[in-house]
Amino acid sequence: MKFALPLLLALFMVGCASTKKKPFAAQRMTVRTTAYTHTEAGGVNNAIGSRLRFGGDTFSAASDWSWLPLGTRFRMVENGRTYVIEDYGSALVGRKTIDLYVPSMGEVRKWGVRNVDIEILEWGSKAMSLKLLKPRATRDYIQTMVAELQKTVPPSALAAATL
């Protein structure tokens, strides 16, 4: 009986001990990329109303949000730059293409179309993507993204989504 209390205490401590989480293993993939600039239709702001970014520690990118949702962060292997998905475009829907923001049409032409390796650093939010897109679903390409997102986003997640 005198060993019961220390044994119970030891079992309790082992049961409550936290396990170390394994470090996030970045998912690597090869993707088709194109480039766009602010002199095209969308202007200097991205889909969430912030300025498009080029330089610094994060660069702006666009995708089909039903594939790579808003907020997805990735690193391009060839140049080490970190990008965040914060925009979308009609030419991207259903094409598994990432459009990289660059500051000029000259840079758009220079980039062209390239297949590059990326590492996903953090997945964005499909629920937040859906929440932002639903009120904008007056165009076919946005309706397509909304329909795809609705297949995977439960209503409870949509209600809880915040930017």
Which residues make up each language-model segment?
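Positively charged n-region of N-terminal signal peptides that target proteins for export
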Residues: 1-5
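C-terminal motif of bacterial Sec signal peptides marking the signal peptidase cleavage site
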Residues: 13-15
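Solvent-exposed, well-ordered loop and adjacent helix/strand elements within mature globular domains
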Residues: 17-163
